[in-house]
Structures are given as structure tokens and as C-alpha cells.
């Protein structure tokens, strides 16, 4: 009987221990767990809400586009080898009459050019597909930055193209254009960005630098080792795109000033030296300046290869014209190289110069793709000193047809599409 009472007492004490001590602990644990879950849920909901709140439509669009471009192995693709494809859907990238900043000089349709097919050719690389040009995506990359074209009138041509390619997505009143003696600056207020052009046809100092000496009527005189005067204006840019070619093609020699500066009077003391020697010297001066003044972690450097001319129609087997004035189609047979007179020796000097520097320089090989575009020049539909060509001038294409510069919209837009690929995806 006592044994039974002892067992009952132990059972009673165990139950009492559970009720008094363990049960409250268990209930407290349940309460704390539920409270934690509630707080975690509230925290996760808060974070998700904030995340969605800060994703703008532009950012979502950019994400989607980045996912698509993952399929494009641009880093393995030679985007400069390909063919021209007629594309009425995506090209032209803008309309001539919708770009308020397009000058009469290259507005060929406005100036009476009757055909427009030259605006509708898209460059298709051989080994990859390219994402469609997205002006908003490019402007996002340029936000808070400065992009500068430096060189001759071909680069001014390309700068105008770039301005027209992006300006349509910028609200009215948020974009301005300013011209100075050496520069043209397109300011994009909404993005705190600028796209500018700096006139330096030889990169180094020359007598063709002043505004009243740019018509090509005066033989150029240069100082091959003097670049700092120009370079001071380049230092704070985030993207520098250089070119120098067309002024080198006039003669087999070029005049080199004996003095160190043009400021010491109008000296005629100069030496005439072969263009290849001086071109190499100028590019050496240029690359040394870049190495001493440009931080490659902050500034990206590009060099555009030679923009070809089409001044002999016999080069492409057409003997009824004299230059490019009757051309409305590209050369579509790209299975064999074409010789339209591009100075390949200058090309090789430039290519080698960009390869042998301490700072990386992206060589934009626009030459071959452009050699097939005999149809794209301003020809009779540009302007000379702000004046359209007269009927009498059009009877003399050998003298007056401009087969150097390019109509816009047109070929320079394709150059800028490829430049934009480097800026958006490769850098």
C-alpha cells in the first residue's frame, strides 16, 4: 500500500513539475517564435515593397535588354567584318526633319536628294547579331559623363550623327547646342552629360586650326611635337574618340614648321617631309600625351580608322560618271576586296600606333565596311560655305561633287552604332 502511494506521489510531482515549469516555457517559446515570424514577414514585405518602388520602368527595360544581349557574344565577335543588309524596319534610326540640330551641310534630303535608300542599310556582322540601338541605354551609360570626338570634318560629320541619334528621347528644353572657336558642345541637362566635337584635323597644332583656315584652300603646316595646346581640352573627358586622315591625303609631303609655335609671327620657315614619316611622328606625339595625361581607369580611348573617299567611279567598274554623284546603291559584292584609293599605309601606321601604347586604345576599323558605301556621300546635296550647289556646279562633278563627307541619316550612324556597342557592352 505504501509502495502504491509512493508511485502515485511521484507521478503527481512530475505532472506538477510539467504544469508549473515546462508548460510556461513551452508556451513562451511558441509566442516568441510566432512573434519572430511576424516580424520577419513584415521585414520581407517592407523590403520587397521598397525594391519594387525603386525599380523605374527604364531600369526594368535595361534589365530586359541586358538579358537579351547575353545571347550576343560581342567579346568574341569581329563586328567590323560583315555585310550591308537593306532594312526598312529599323533604319534610318531617326528622321532628318526631326533632328533640329542637323546642319544643312549634310541634310541631303532637305537639299533635294531624290532617293532615300541610302538611309536604310544596316550593318550585319558575319559572326554575330547586334542588339538594336537604344538611345536611352546609351544615355544611361553617359550619365554624368563627357564624350568627345576629336579630329577633322569627318568626325564632325560623325558627331552630328551621334547628336541626332540620341536627341529625340531628350525632353525639349533639356538639350542645348553651343559652338566655340574649337568646339561644338551638345549638352544633355537631364543626364548631366555632354557630347562634343573638338576641331584638330592633325591632332597636333597646325595652321588649319583657326576657324577661318578650315576650307582646305591653304596648304597645311603642322608642328608634329606640339599637342598640349589641344590636349588641355581633352583631359576631363570620359570617352575620347580620335581621327586624323583626310588632310593627309592631299600631297605626298607635308610642311613642318621649323619654329616651336605659330605665335612667333607668320613664319614661312618650314621643311617639306614625306607624309608617312610625319604621320608616324604625330601619332607618336599623340600616344605619349595619352600615356602621360590620361588615366585609363577613368577614360576610354578610341581611334577611328580612315573614312574612305569615292572619287573615281572606275574603281567600282562604273564609267558613266566621274565620282560618286550618280550612286544610289552600295557595292553589294563583298566577296572580294575593293580598292577605292584608301591609303593603306597610313592605315597600318595608325593600327600599329594604337597597339604599342601603355594605355588601351580601341581601334574602330570603319574603313572596309565604308569602302562599299559609294552611295552614301553628300555629293551634290551638301553645301559649300553654307550655300547649296548651283545647276552650273552640278554640271562639273569632278570639281564640285563631295565624295568625302556623308549624308545624314546615313553611314556615320552605323559607325556610332558600333561605337555604342563598345561603350555599353564591352567596357
UniProtKB/Swiss-Prot annotation:
Localization in the cell: Membrane
Keyword Transmembrane: yes
Membrane topology label: Single-pass type II membrane protein
Main location group: membrane
The entry's keywords: Membrane, Signal-anchor, Transmembrane, Transmembrane helix
InterPro entries: TBL, TBL_C, TBL_N
Sequence motif: GDS motif, positions: 151-153
Annotated motif DCXHWCLPGXXDXWN motif, positions: 402-416
Molecular function terms, GO-annotated: O-acetyltransferase activity
Transmembrane segments: 12-32
UniProt GO cellular component terms: membrane
Miscellaneous comment: Contains 2 motifs that are conserved in esterases, but it is unlikely that this protein belongs to the catalytically active pectin esterases.
Similarity section: Belongs to the PC-esterase family. TBL subfamily.
Biological role: May act as a bridging protein that binds pectin and other cell wall polysaccharides. Probably involved in maintaining esterification of pectins. May be involved in the specific O-acetylation of cell wall polymers.
UniProt-recorded name of the protein: Protein trichome birefringence-like 30
Species, as recorded: Arabidopsis thaliana (Mouse-ear cress)
Classification lineage: Eukaryota, Viridiplantae, Streptophyta, Embryophyta, Tracheophyta
Amino acid at each position: 500500500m505504501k509502495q502504491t502511494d509512493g508511485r502515485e506521489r511521484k507521478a503527481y510531482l512530475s505532472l506538477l513539475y510539467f504544469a508549473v515549469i515546462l508548460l510556461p516555457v513551452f508556451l513562451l517559446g511558441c509566442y516568441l517564435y510566432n512573434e519572430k515570424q511576424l516580424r520577419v514577414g513584415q521585414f520581407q514585405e517592407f523590403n520587397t515593397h521598397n525594391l519594387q518602388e525603386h525599380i523605374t520602368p527604364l531600369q526594368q527595360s535595361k534589365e530586359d535588354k541586358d538579358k537579351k544581349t547575353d545571347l550576343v557574344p560581342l567579346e568574341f565577335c569581329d563586328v567590323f567584318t560583315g555585310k550591308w543588309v537593306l532594312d526598312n524596319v529599323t533604319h534610318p534610326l531617326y528622321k532628318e526633319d526631326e533632328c533640329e540640330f542637323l546642319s544643312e551641310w549634310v541634310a541631303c534630303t532637305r537639299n533635294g536628294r531624290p532617293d532615300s535608300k541610302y538611309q536604310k542599310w544596316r550593318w550585319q556582322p558575319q559572326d554575330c547579331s547586334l542588339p538594336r540601338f537604344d538611345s536611352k541605354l546609351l544615355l544611361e551609360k553617359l550619365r554624368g559623363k563627357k564624350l568627345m570626338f576629336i579630329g577633322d570634318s569627318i568626325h564632325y560629320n560623325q558627331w552630328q550623327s551621334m547628336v541626332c541619334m540620341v536627341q529625340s528621347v531628350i525632353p525639349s528644353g533639356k538639350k542645348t547646342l553651343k559652338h566655340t572657336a574649337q568646339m561644338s558642345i551638345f549638352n544633355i541637362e537631364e543626364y548631366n552629360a555632354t557630347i562634343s566635337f573638338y576641331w584638330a584635323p592633325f591632332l597636333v597644332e597646325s595652321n588649319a586650326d583657326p576657324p577661318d583656315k578650315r576650307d582646305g584652300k591653304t596648304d597645311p603646316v603642322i608642328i608634329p611635337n606640339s599637342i598640349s595646346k589641344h590636349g588641355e581640352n581633352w583631359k576631363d573627358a570620359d570617352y575620347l574618340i580620335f581621327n586624323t586622315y583626310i588632310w593627309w591625303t592631299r600631297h605626298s609631303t607635308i610642311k613642318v614648321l621649323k619654329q616651336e609655335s605659330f605665335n612667333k609671327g607668320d613664319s614661312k620657315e618650314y621643311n617639306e617631309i614625306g607624309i608617312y614619316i610625319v604621320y608616324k611622328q604625330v601619332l607618336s606625339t599623340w600616344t605619349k600625351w595619352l600615356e602621360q595625361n590620361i588615366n585609363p581607369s577613368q577614360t576610354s580611348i578610341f581611334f577611328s580608322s580612315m573614312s574612305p573617299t569615292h572619287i573615281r567611279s572606275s574603281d567600282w567598274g562604273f564609267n558613266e560618271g566621274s565620282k560618286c554623284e550618280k550612286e544610289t546603291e552600295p557595292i553589294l559584292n563583298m566577296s572580294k576586296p575593293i580598292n577605292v584609293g584608301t591609303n593603306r599605309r597610313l592605315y597600318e601606321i595608325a593600327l600599329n600606333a594604337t597597339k604599342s601604347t601603355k594605355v588601351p586604345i580601341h581601334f574602330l576599323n570603319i574603313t572596309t565596311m565604308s569602302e562599299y558605301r559609294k552611295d552614301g556621300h553628300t555629293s551634290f546635296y551638301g553645301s559649300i560655305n553654307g550655300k547649296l550647289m548651283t545647276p552650273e556646279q552640278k554640271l562639273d562633278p569632278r570639281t564640285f561633287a563631295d565624295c568625302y563627307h556623308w549624308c545624314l541619316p546615313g553611314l556615320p550612324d552605323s559607325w556610332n552604332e558600333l561605337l555604342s556597342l563598345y561603350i555599353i557592352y564591352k567596357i
